[in-house]
């Protein structure tokens, strides 16, 4: 696999030099300074690509070209944003970039309630507390009809949780959920957030699928034409939240996805941490079934807690994900491609490392501090080497 690393551009506290020292060769990044929906101009792409290459690295994957909210709701200028998206793909291809990760999650890209959950060893992780999230929905946001999403027992637990919160706790939880996490292109005030949610009140999962299908049927033929692999990222967490439709969460969703737009350019980002939150997702089976459509991998693990809807980010080789067999399945597919004459390795990045050691004293992007990902990348490198020697005679 190609060892890659997510970089948030020149303002990222982790420098390109740091990344190269970590042993990565590929960069996963985006033009975060360009507003959602606007065309990525060739000169802007080339500028960022040259910056990366001057550091001895390559721009391996775009993560992400954001999908404008009006595309997701099919309102306003959605056709304009789709046409802009097509031109961005053409421009990326002209600059030699061949893989684009994106998501179709409404309003929020990914959601956590705690960005500094302290583990027993003193390191810090990201966490999603189901009851804390319920307290936010029911008593802070006060989303209409939110109680329908929770059992009576959960509502009581959420009320108890909320009653113990200080004003600072409320502010922090709200900020964690709606202010935008790394990689998210939108942040909101509480009122703006509810306004965004209201845009989806009449959009069921079935209707939302028709919106995704329309997007795919517009975009994927262009990607196929110019030689770009589109790799959709799963919902995070992979279940309905905030009354919003979530349609990239299960193996059934993956099957619908490839049947809806069967061109080879239409593929997946296998994010083990996102899919792995659900105990009914068999990650190895999902990887094997859709192996030829996996164009990018995010490798991380999560640990479900006593409440199975609550989870935290585990160490990369621990937690609920069978990382040994996951990496083995990815290598099986990679060697199949190589044996058929393909030369492109599957780009993989260690995702959401723990904040640890010296990084505990630094300002870092939540989930994207250097040392935790350095540790994860080294572990994956060792696991890959062992698997190759034992199973692939390499």
Curated annotation (Swiss-Prot):
UniProt keyword terms in alphabetical order: Iron, Lyase, Manganese
Broad class of enzyme this protein falls into: lyase
Reactions mediated catalytically: D-mannonate = 2-dehydro-3-deoxy-D-gluconate + H2O
Keyword Repeat assigned: no
Entry's family note: Belongs to the mannonate dehydratase family.
Function: Catalyzes the dehydration of D-mannonate.
The name this protein goes by in its record: Mannonate dehydratase
Organism: Haemophilus influenzae (strain PittGG)
Lineage: Bacteria, Pseudomonadati, Pseudomonadota, Gammaproteobacteria, Pasteurellales
Gene: uxuA
């Amino acid at each position: 696999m190609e060892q890659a690393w997510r970089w948030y551009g020149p303002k990222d506290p982790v420098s390109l030099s740091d990344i190269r020292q970590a042993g990565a060769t590929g960069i996963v990044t985006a033009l975060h300074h360009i507003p959602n929906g606007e065309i990525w101009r060739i000169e802007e792409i080339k500028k960022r690509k040259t910056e990366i290459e001057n550091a001895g690295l390559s721009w391996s994957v775009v993560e992400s070209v954001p999908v404008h909210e009006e595309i997701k709701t099919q309102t306003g200028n959605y056709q304009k944003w789709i046409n802009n998206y097509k031109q961005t793909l053409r421009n990326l291809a002209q600059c030699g970039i061949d893989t684009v990760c994106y998501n179709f999650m409404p309003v929020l890209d990914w959601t956590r309630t705690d960005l500094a959950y302290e583990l027993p060893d003193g390191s810090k992780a990201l966490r999603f507390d189901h009851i804390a999230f319920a307290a936010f929905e029911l008593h802070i946001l006060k989303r209409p009809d939110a109680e329908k999403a929770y059992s009576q027992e959960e509502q009581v637990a959420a009320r108890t949780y909320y009653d113990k919160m200080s004003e600072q706790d409320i502010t922090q939880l709200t900020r964690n959920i709606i202010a935008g996490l790394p990689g998210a292109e939108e942040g909101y005030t509480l009122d703006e957030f509810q306004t965004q949610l209201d845009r989806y009140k009449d959009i069921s999962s079935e209707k939302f699928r028709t919106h995704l299908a329309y997007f795919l049927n517009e975009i994927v033929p262009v990607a196929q034409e110019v030689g770009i692999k589109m790799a959709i990222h799963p919902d995070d967490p992979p279940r309905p939240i905030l009354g919003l439709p979530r349609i990239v969460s299960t193996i059934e969703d993956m099957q619908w996805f490839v049947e809806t737009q069967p061109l080879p350019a239409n593929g997946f980002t296998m994010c083990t941490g996102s899919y792995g939150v659900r105990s009914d997702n068999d990650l190895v089976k999902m990887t094997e079934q859709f192996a030829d459509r996996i164009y990018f991998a995010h490798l991380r693990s999560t640990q479900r807690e006593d409440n199975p809807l609550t989870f935290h980010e585990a160490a990369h080789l621990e937690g609920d994900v069978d990382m040994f067999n996951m990496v083995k399945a990815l290598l099986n597919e990679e060697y199949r491609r190589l044996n058929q004459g393909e030369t492109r390795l599957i780009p993989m990045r260690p995702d959401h490392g723990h904040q640890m050691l010296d990084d505990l004293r630094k300002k870092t992007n939540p989930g994207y501090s250097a040392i935790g990902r350095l540790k994860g990348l080294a572990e994956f490198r060792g696991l890959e080497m062992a698997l190759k020697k034992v199973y692939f005679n390499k």
